[in-house]
From Swiss-Prot:
The keyword Cell wall biogenesis/degradation does not apply. Binds 2 magnesium or manganese ions per subunit. Mn(2+) 1 binds at residues 273-274. GO terms for molecular function: metal ion binding; protein serine/threonine phosphatase activity. GO terms for cellular component: cytoplasm; nucleolus; nucleoplasm; nucleus; protein-containing complex. This is Protein phosphatase 1E. It is found in: Nucleus; Cytoplasm.
Length: 755
């Protein structure tokens, strides 16, 4: 068809497959009563005269020609076989096993060859059945829409097509004569509400749905292009409760469902938490959005329309509860999005939270008896709020507002509160949930769980609700849990942007304020939010996942350290041949940026003389000094003297400490001493920041990390992946490592003990 939408081919294909499974309104359910009596008169009228004719012909044949008796009997049997299969075929068409069995039994005696019955059709899946047995005329539209959507979503129908089919079917049902479905009034002298039998209504709804699907396959109507939907993640569990009393609603194409052509794009999401039974939650999930559209102020004031829809839904369910002796209620929270406006309405303790730029934003305050304004309202009506495991209204319910609960009116009312906010594009997502979630997970924890899940799965949000439900259950929730996460923007792009920029913003900016004791800042940041990782339970399939607290990531950002291109480690394989390979000569290893410690600048000011580097390594015995070269700032290379207060080495390279057991204590006494000849004094600074903040490169070759210090202790931190010149030397080094836990370096006159 000219001008058809691109999705028409997909929709037609779905309708063909759907009709193959949904072969009629009575498939898998109760048969229609009308076609039952049609095949009955056919087998009764024809077979009756046949026995008389056969007997007369047989008598005449026996008198005139006795020898032809066998031929007459054979002809009679052939006639019986020609007449008998007719009722069998009719019974098979009807699908009634009892009539088919009776016809087969009637044809079986005296006959050896009976044709096998035709194969039976596979059983059809049962159709959705309404919960209530009777409804009013005002509730027909909601019931019709719900029955259609249930049946279509069971076959994974696209949301746009499901909304269009449900709207067309509901309109056909509302325009039909519903008087045939009325329940007769009771003759008790009282005037009651006109009620409709829901089973008959359901049969009519499915019949109309089947007819519309058949017509749309042949001639698909011209429909507007489906809108872009908000990505959602939904999960609900019964948890440890005996029954599941939560219900949720997700209508991404609100305009199509109610045939609204002059409105902006609209979406509707709701969570209802029932108590005392599931009837109230089901009723609200079916009828509240229908009552919303029927309000006069809906086009220009959706927030007020939501409040009135809650009130109307509460009043009608209270009437229904009186007719059917129901004693239950439900809390509820609804979010309605129209264009760039977010409208929220709620009764009870079901909640919704907004996350903007990674921060939780409070949109509402739940209705609980411990709220001072709610307590005053209840007491003004003559009720009371008492503590009985929790604050309860009249010692019974722990919520102060709800739909239903007729026996607790007016203390527990159905008046909803509302709130509206403008969506400026910085919003991330919404989390709608019942009290089973929010009683154990606070908003900040929920944000952490979502952010961790998104970064672990590269922005895939399909299992976010499952992760939130699992976090509430693991936190101790035993109530029903329902969670809906509505993403207001593409979180995959948000995660990718954060991976590029977040670590730059959070790592080593400004001065060092943690005393330099940031040992954890040695690894690469592989995730944008490394600080808050939540472990997923095993039943969600995250068994192989590593918690980010085991990753070496920064938990306390420090000052910025700009390291040279060959940062912080002495690679002796890259030194010029004219320079000796010893600790007496070290390359410049560190350069502090703008955030350098003040003491480092003070050292540069005090240093006015450079010592020449000797080309040979002297033997040391006892305490001594040797020069080392460091570049602390931009003033150039400085020669410092490192003094050992106790003997630290003896002999030349490849020799070990003579007293290995005392190496740790000896190394702990290393200090920096800086000399200035013309002032004739020594300055002993105490460093409170690390001079190196990078891991060893782990490449083949000898490397030595710079001296490191902390506010509490001084020590040398090293990593020496020694050169593997020969297998014999490598084996010897490994033997020494296993025996003494020392790492021998062939180019240095001492060894380092592993920390």
């Amino acid at each position: 068809m000219a001008g058809c939408i691109p999705e028409e081919k997909t929709y037609r294909r779905f309708l063909e497959l759907f009709l193959g499974e949904f072969r009629g309104p009575c498939g898998g359910g109760e048969p229609e009563p009308e076609p039952e009596p049609e095949p009955e008169p056919e087998p009764e009228s024809e077979p009756e005269p046949e026995p008389e004719l056969v007997e007369a012909e047989a008598a005449e044949a026996s008198v005139e020609e006795p020898g032809e008796e066998a031929a007459t009997v054979a002809a009679t049997e052939e006639g019986d076989q020609e007449q008998d299969p007719e009722p069998e075929e009719e019974a098979a068409v009807e699908g009634e096993e009892e009539e088919e069995g009776a016809a087969t039994a009637a044809a079986a005696p005296g006959h050896s060859a009976v044709p096998p019955p035709p194969p039976q059709l596979p059983p059809l899946p049962p159709l959705p059945r309404p919960l209530s047995e009777r409804i009013t005329r005002e509730e027909v539209e909601g019931e019709s829409l719900d029955l259609c959507l249930q049946q279509l979503y069971k076959y994974n129908c696209p949301s746009f097509l499901a909304a269009a089919l449900a709207r067309a079917t509901s309109d056909e049902v509302l325009q039909s004569d519903l008087s045939a479905h009325y329940i007769p009034k009771e003759t008790d002298g009282t005037e009651g509400t006109v009620e409709i039998e829901t089973v008959k209504l359901a049969r009519s709804v499915f019949s109309k749905l089947h007819e519309i699907c058949c017509s749309w396959v042949k001639d698909f109507p011209l429909r507007r292009r489906p809108q872009l939907y908000y990505e959602t993640s939904i999960h609900a569990i019964k948890n440890m409760r005996r029954k599941m009393e939560d219900k949720h609603v997700c209508i991404p194409d609100f305009n199509m469902l109610f045939n609204l052509e002059d409105q902006e794009e609209q979406a509707y999401f709701a969570v209802f938490d029932g108590h005392g039974g599931v009837d109230a939650a089901i009723y609200a999930s079916i009828h509240l959005h229908v009552n919303l559209v029927r309000q006069e102020m809906f086009p220009h004031d959706p927030a007020e329309a939501l409040c009135r829809a809650f009130r109307v839904t509460d009043e009608r369910f209270v009437q229904k509860a009186a007719r059917e002796s129901l004693r239950c209620g439900t809390t509820g929270v609804v979010t309605f999005i129209r264009g760039n406006m977010l409208h929220v309405a709620w009764v009870g303790d079901s909640q919704v939270m907004l996350v903007r730029k990674g921060q939780a934003v409070e949109l509402m305050k739940p209705h609980k008896p411990d709220r001072e304004d709610e307590k005053q309202r209840i007491e003004a009506l003559g009720g009371c709020v008492v503590w009985f495991g929790a604050w309860r209204v009249n010692g019974s319910l722990s919520v102060s507002r709800a739909i239903g609960d007729a026996e607790h009116k007016p203390y527990i009312c159905g008046d909803a509160d509302s709130a509206s906010t403008v969506l400026d594009g910085t919003e991330d997502y919404l989390i709608l949930a019942c009290d089973g979630f929010y009683d154990t997970v606070n908003p900040d924890e929920a944000v952490k769980v979502v952010s961790d899940h998104l970064k672990e799965n590269n922005g895939d949000s399909s299992m976010v609700a499952h992760k939130l439900v699992a976090s509430a259950r693991d936190a101790g929730s035993s109530d029903n849990i329902t969670v809906i996460v509505v993403f207001l923007r593409d979180m995959n792009k948000a995660v990718n942007v954060s991976e590029e920029s977040d670590w730059t913003e959070n790592s080593f900016q400004g001065g060092q304020e943690d005393g330099g004791d940031d040992k954890e800042n040695h690894g690469e940041c592989k995730r944008p939010w490394p600080q808050h990782q939540c472990s997923a339970p095993a039943d969600l399939g995250y068994d192989g996942r590593v918690d980010s607290f085991t990753d070496r990531t920064s938990l306390s950002p420090g000052s910025q350290i700009n390291v040279l291109e060959d940062p912080g480690y002495l690679d002796l394989t890259q030194i010029e041949a004219s320079k000796p390979h010893s600790a007496q000569f070290l390359l410049p290893v560190e350069m502090f940026g703008p955030g350098a410690p003040k003491k480092a600048n003070l050292i540069n000011e005090l240093m006015m003389e450079k010592k020449s580097v000797q080309s040979s390594l002297p033997e040391w015995s006892g305490a001594g000094e040797f020069p080392t070269a460091f570049n602390l700032g931009s003033t150039g290379e400085q020669i410092y003297r490192m003094q050992s207060l106790s003997p630290v080495c003896s002999g030349l390279e490849n020799e070990q400490f003579k007293s290995p057991g005392n190496r740790v204590s000896r190394l702990s006494h290393l200090r920096h001493h800086y000399s200035k000849k013309w002032h004739r004094f020594r300055f002993n600074p105490k460093f409170y920041s690390f001079l190196s903040a990078q891991e060893p490169s782990h490449k083949i070759g000898t490397s030595l990390s710079s001296l490191t210090g902390s506010g509490k202790r001084n020590r040398i931190r090293s990593s020496l992946p020694w050169r593997q010149n020969s297998w014999k030397g490598y084996s010897e080094n490994m033997r020494k490592l296993r025996k003494t836990h020392d790492i021998p370096c062939p180019d240095l006159p001492w060894s380092y003990k592993i920390e």
